[in-house]
């Protein structure tokens, strides 16, 4: 993949993150991009670990839907 495609992919992900609720975006960013554990995210956000898991699950679904709707198939 080319540098231009990589930049495009990053922009797609950035735009999809902006489409999430703030709490979902926070959980996704901390867990997947910063490698923070679910328990630590719960402590940081002040929400129960089970709720963090729900936000991660819902956020991932929304990201996948957004990216597919905008032409990203995972192979670009």
PLM region spans:
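Acidic, proline/glycine-rich intrinsically disordered inter-domain spacer in sigma factors
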Residues: 1-18
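C-terminal edge and immediately downstream basic/flexible tail or linker adjoining helix-turn-helix-like DNA-binding
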Residues: 15, 43-46, 61-76
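The N-cap/first-turn positions of alpha helices
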Residues: 23-24
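A short pre-motif secondary-structure segment
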Residues: 27-31
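Helix-turn-helix DNA-binding motif, specifically the short coil turn and the N-cap/start of the second
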Residues: 37, 46-51
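Residues within the DNA-recognition helix of helix-turn-helix
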Residues: 55-58
